[in-house]
Amino acid sequence: MKKKFATVIKMAVCSLLAVAVPALAQGEAFRITTCAVGAGPDSVAVADVNGDGRLDLISANNLADTLTVLTNNGAGGFGSNATLIVGSGPYAVVAVDINGDGKPDLICANNLANTLTVLTNNGNGGFGPNATLNVGSYPVFVVAADVNGDGKPDLISANNGASTLTVLTNNGSGGFGSNATLTVGSGPYAVVAADVNGDGKRDLISANYYANTLTVLTNNGSGGFGFNATLAVGSGPLAVVATDVNGDGRLDLICANYGTNTLTVLTNNGSGRFGSNVTLTVSGLPHAMVVADINGDGKMDLISANFSVYPNAGTLTVLTNNGTGGFGSNSVVNVGLQPFSLAAADLNGDGTVDLISANHGDNTLTVLMQTGGSLPRLSIANTGLKTFRISWLLPATGFVLETNANMSGTNWGAAGYLITTNGTTAGVNVTSSVNHLFFRLAK
């Protein structure tokens, strides 16, 4: 399924109130493709697994005990699916070259087996042999980072059932040893490795779902960690990322709070301490998050994947960065059912950032490719009691005005209003007494 969307606006009828909601990525066009994968995809990774210079997709299929590899055909499509058997309950996957041969290997966290599976890349997109690494109870996340300064990527798992992180150091040939166990807050669901205190060493930050906190563990430079700091955030944090949101050269922290439908932004004071918390509201139940310059202005924007309530489609919320640590232009696009994970990468080599969600509820990946051009934007104005004019700039060749009562992914239909033109604009006149209507241009 492929479709382009322009602005989505919300018409709220309450006395003479009309509210316009900006388009995704300030009007940037996306081509949306749905890719079938294994049952219950809970994570997606991006890497060139077959060495053809194109970024491929890898999903961790929690209910199938498999990974699915979809190779990029170079034109924005994906095929040549391969299925890889891993441990029980793969919940997260990461792609990184662990043995120094220049090829991205795959590592997944198996939450029912309390293990990591390591699959080495043979150079043409095939993988083997598998290695199994024991970690803590119920690992739900894995990240690769050089934590001891030897130039080799180590592995860190977030063990939700044990409230710990497991650190496995890389011996340089693809093997791992010297496991360390680090205690964090209750129910860690994600971990990020980032230098938050400016000493050149990768620190660890976990998002602790049951504790409603982040734990910051500073790196001593030899692979050990100390000075635990606890940061209060919203209810049920499921994801955490590190990026410089205000342009001061320091890595700030952002977490997605599933229980409060919010993101928390914590600014870095330069010594690894955090303050000036800002709360950003997103649409229902944020489950994952990435940072990426989605609109090409050189500033890192925030994108959350929102689980939503079944049977409503999941959504992505995009919040654009104003460059001083603030975020605006909150905008929404529909994806598949129950998006668990999110990735951002330039999949078609056009210089713009594309988005990929792993949708647990319908066994798919949703791929949103930026087309590189702006779409016509809708605007709304009151013209009388319970009457509105919805308009857009011409030309808008090939676009159809659609409406929906609830922003679901399945109930959009042709609006059916008479379109009239006035010089450089086209539009429709709407009379309605319902509380909310949503409109979009679709192609």
Residue ranges and their predicted role:
Residues 10-22:
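Bacterial N-terminal signal peptides
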Residues 22-39, 71-88, 120-137, 169-186, ...:
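Blade-edge motifs of beta-propeller repeat domains
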Residues 42-49, 91-98, 140-147, 189-196, ...:
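Beta-propeller blade termini
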Residues 53-55, 79, 102-104, 151-153, ...:
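Glycine-aliphatic tripeptides that mark coil-to-beta-strand junctions in extracellular
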Residues 57-60, 106-109, 155-158, 204-207, ...:
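Hydrophobic beta-strand segments that make up the repeating blades of beta-propeller
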Residues 63-65, 112-114, 161-163, 210-212, ...:
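Short glycine/acidic-enriched loop and turn motifs that connect beta-strands
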Residues 340-374:
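Blade-level signature of beta-propeller repeat domains, shared across WD40, Kelch, NHL, RCC1
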Residues 373-443:
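Short, composition-biased motifs enriched in small/polar/acidic residues
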